[in-house]
C-alpha cells in the first residue's frame, strides 16, 4: 500500500497517528519555549541562586493570592453583615475610609525607613510577609465582628500597605544580586510575569474552593464563612515557608553589619572567608540578628554613648594627634562568673586556667561561637564611627570585636587592667588581619567597597583639634 492510502478497514492513512503525535509534541515544545522565553531570563544572564529564588517565589505568590481572595471575600461579607448592610452608601463610605486611612501605613514606611532598607533587605522582606499575613488574618475574621468593621479593616489595610510597600522597595536590591549582564530590567520583567501567572493560579484555586463551599453553604451557611478561616493556617504557613526558602536562596554580595560580623567570626576562627552561600545560610531573617544574641553583641552608635564621661573620651583620644576613624568600647557584664572560650586564635596570649573549674568552660558543641549558650558574661561592645571612617575602618572595627569575643579570661588582671588589655590586644590583632581580610573578601566575590549601615548606625563624630580637646577634657575632669 502506498503512503497516504486508506487502510483496508477504511480508516486513516498509515502514519497519520504518528504525525499527529509529532505535531502535538512539536506544538508542546514550542509552547514551552515561548513560555520559558516570556517568564524566565536567559540562564547565562543570571546567577545560579536565581532559580531557587524564582521557584519558591512562584509557590509563595500562589499561596499569597489565595489568602488575598479569601480576605477580600470576608471583607465583603463583613460589609454586608454590618450596620450598613441596608445602606449601600454607608458601606461604600466604610470601604473608602478603610483604603484612605490604610495609605497612612505606606506614608509611614516611606518616611521612616528609607535608609534602613538597603542595609537589611532580607529581614525587611520577610518581616513584610509576616505583617501582610497577620493583616490578612484580621480581614478574614472581620465578619465575626461586623460592628467593628471600620477599625478592623483600617488596621488590616494599614498593615497590608506596610507589607506591600516594604516588599516593593526591597525587590530591586534582591533582583540586582542575580544579574550577570547588566540585565536588571529583564530580570524584573520576568519576575513580574511569573507573579502574574502565580497570582492567577492562586485566584483560580481560591475561587474554585469558594464555589465548591458555596454549594455546601446552601445547607449550612456558617461553613462558607468558616472556610477562609480554616484555609488561612496552611496557606499562611506555606506562604512564610516559601518566602523563607526564597530569601535563604539569595546570596547577597553586599556587606551589612550582620554579614560583616558573621564573616569576621568565621575568619577569626578558621582564617578563611566563608562563601556567600554559607553566610546566607547563617543569616537570620527575623529580628534579632544572629550576633545580637552572642556573648558580646555589637552596637554601632554615637560617640556620646560610647564615651559617656570626659575621662573615657580622653582615654579614647589619647595617642593620636588626629581623630581616630572609630572608637570602640565595651561594657563588661555584671556577672561574677567567667568563661574561657575554647577558640584557637593566632598570637593570642596563653590562656590562664587558674581558679577556673571544668564547669565554667564552654564546650565546643556548636559550629560557631555565637551559637553557644548565652551567658551574659561579657556585656556589649559599643562602636562610634568618625565622619572620615572608610569601609576598611568599619571592617577593622568588626574584626576587632570578633577578636574581643575570642580573647581568654585573664584572672591575673584587675577589671581596669583587663579592659585596657582586651582593647589593645584585639586592636593589634585586627590591624594584623585587615589586609588579608579585605583581600580574601574580594577574592570570594564580596563587595567590600561599602559597608551598609542603617540610619541609626550613621551618627558620625568629627574632631578638628584632638590635642586641644584632650586638654579641655582633662581640665574638666580635674575641676570635677
Language-model features, listed with the residues they occupy:
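Hydrophobic transmembrane alpha-helices of Major Facilitator Superfamily
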Residues: 66, 104, 161-169
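Short membrane-interface loop/juxtamembrane segments of multi-pass integral membrane proteins
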Residues: 175-190
Amino acid at each position: 500500500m502506498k503512503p497516504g492510502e486508506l487502510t483496508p478497514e477504511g480508516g486513516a492513512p498509515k502514519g497519520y497517528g504518528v504525525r499527529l503525535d509529532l505535531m502535538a509534541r512539536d506544538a508542546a515544545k514550542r509552547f514551552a519555549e515561548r513560555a520559558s522565553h516570556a517568564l524566565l531570563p536567559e540562564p547565562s544572564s543570571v546567577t545560579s541562586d536565581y532559580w531557587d529564588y524564582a521557584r519558591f517565589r512562584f509557590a509563595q505568590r500562589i499561596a499569597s493570592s489565595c489568602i488575598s481572595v479569601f480576605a477580600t471575600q470576608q471583607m465583603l461579607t463583613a460589609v454586608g453583615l454590618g450596620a450598613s448592610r441596608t445602606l449601600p452608601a454607608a458601606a461604600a463610605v466604610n470601604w473608602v475610609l478603610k483604603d484612605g486611612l490604610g495609605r497612612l501605613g505606606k506614608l509611614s514606611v516611606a518616611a521612616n525607613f528609607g535608609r534602613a532598607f538597603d542595609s537589611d533587605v532580607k529581614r525587611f522582606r520577610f518581616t513584610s510577609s509576616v505583617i501582610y499575613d497577620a493583616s490578612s488574618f484580621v480581614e478574614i475574621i472581620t465578619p465575626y465582628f461586623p460592628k467593628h468593621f471600620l477599625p478592623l479593616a483600617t488596621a488590616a489595610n494599614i498593615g497590608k500597605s506596610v507589607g506591600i510597600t516594604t516588599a516593593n522597595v526591597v525587590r530591586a536590591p534582591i533582583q540586582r544580586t542575580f544579574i550577570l549582564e547588566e540585565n536588571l530590567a529583564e530580570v524584573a520583567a520576568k519576575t513580574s510575569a511569573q507573579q502574574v501567572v502565580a497570582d492567577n493560579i492562586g485566584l483560580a484555586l481560591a475561587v474554585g474552593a469558594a464555589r465548591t463551599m458555596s454549594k455546601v453553604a446552601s445547607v449550612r451557611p456558617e461553613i462558607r464563612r468558616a472556610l477562609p478561616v480554616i484555609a488561612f493556617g496552611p496557606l499562611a504557613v506555606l506562604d512564610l515557608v516559601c518566602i523563607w526558602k526564597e530569601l535563604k536562596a539569595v546570596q547577597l554580595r553586599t556587606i551589612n553589619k550582620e554579614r560583616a560580623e558573621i564573616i569576621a567570626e568565621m575568619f577569626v576562627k578558621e582564617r578563611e572567608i566563608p562563601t556567600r552561600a554559607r553566610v546566607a545560610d547563617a543569616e537570620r531573617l527575623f529580628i534579632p540578628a544572629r550576633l545580637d544574641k552572642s556573648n558580646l553583641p555589637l552596637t554601632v552608635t554615637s560617640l556620646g554613648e560610647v564615651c559617656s564621661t570626659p575621662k573615657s573620651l580622653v582615654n579614647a583620644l589619647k595617642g593620636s594627634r588626629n581623630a581616630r576613624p572609630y572608637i570602640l568600647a565595651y561594657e563588661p557584664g555584671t556577672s561574677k562568673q567567667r568563661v574561657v572560650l575554647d577558640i584557637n586564635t593566632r598570637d593570642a596570649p596563653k590562656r590562664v586556667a587558674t581558679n577556673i573549674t571544668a564547669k565554667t568552660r564552654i564546650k565546643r558543641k556548636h559550629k560557631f561561637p555565637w551559637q553557644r549558650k548565652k551567658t551574659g558574661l561579657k556585656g556589649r561592645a559599643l562602636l562610634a564611627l568618625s565622619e572620615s571612617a572608610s569601609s576598611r575602618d568599619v571592617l577593622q572595627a568588626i574584626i576587632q570585636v570578633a577578636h574581643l569575643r575570642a580573647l581568654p579570661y585573664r584572672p591575673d588582671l584587675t577589671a581596669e587592667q583587663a579592659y585596657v588589655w582586651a582593647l589593645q590586644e584585639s586592636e593589634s590583632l585586627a590591624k594584623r588581619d585587615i589586609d588579608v581580610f579585605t583581600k580574601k573578601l574580594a577574592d570570594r566575590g564580596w563587595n567590600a567597597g561599602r559597608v551598609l549601615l542603617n540610619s541609626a548606625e550613621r551618627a558620625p563624630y568629627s574632631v578638628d583639634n584632638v590635642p586641644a580637646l584632650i586638654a579641655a577634657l582633662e581640665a574638666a575632669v580635674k575641676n570635677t
